[in-house]
């Protein structure tokens, strides 16, 4: 840690690359550890349930799993998120590049965040493009088949996250 602090103090153009390990202290499990999603038992493997094909062919089951396992309630930014936001305010950190989909970097105050795999906080209609908050996905769980549908056109409202079999957003 002292060496890391020395490097931080000596440099002004830092970019942080991070993933699931950053948010585990906030109570968000990663995918691959012993307690992670991939080691839990489900009807299908998590990689299957989080694939584009599964989303298309088993939409209601996809959303049930998504609501239960990927939307996190009550998670707060931890010391790492807060330290990165502070470094950005100080002008040392130029960007955070993350694979996390939890929005905790922004909740901590980071402004320049590139979410390679998207965010559970953003959701959009696959037909008309209208955006919806995560609460819309949650509330749809208690209605009909549980599939969130656009209030304007009836299209499916999909989480703005990268599923298996999908490419990364080129804008990111």
Question: Where in this protein do the model-derived segments appear?
Answer:
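Conserved catalytic core of sirtuin-type NAD+-dependent deacylases
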Residues: 1-172
């Amino acid at each position: 840690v002292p060496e890391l602090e020395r490097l931080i103090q000596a440099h002004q153009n830092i970019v942080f690359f991070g993933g699931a390990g950053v948010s585990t202290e906030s109570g968000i499990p990663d995918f691959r550890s012993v307690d992670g999603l991939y080691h839990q038992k489900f009807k299908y493997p998590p990689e299957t349930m989080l694939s584009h094909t599964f989303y298309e062919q088993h939409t209601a089951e996809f959303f049930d799993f998504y609501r239960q396992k990927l939307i996190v309630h009550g998670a707060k930014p931890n010391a790492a998120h807060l330290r990165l936001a502070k470094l950005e305010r100080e002008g040392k950190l130029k960007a955070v590049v993350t694979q996390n989909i939890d929005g905790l970097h922004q909740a901590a105050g980071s402004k320049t965040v590139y979410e390679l795999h998207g965010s559970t906080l953003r959701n959009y209609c696959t037909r008309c493009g209208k955006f919806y908050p995560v609460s819309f996905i949650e509330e749809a769980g208690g209605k009909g088949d549980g599939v969130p549908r656009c209030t304007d056109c009836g299209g499916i409202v999909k989480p703005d996250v990268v599923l298996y079999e999908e490419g990364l957003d080129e804008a990111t």
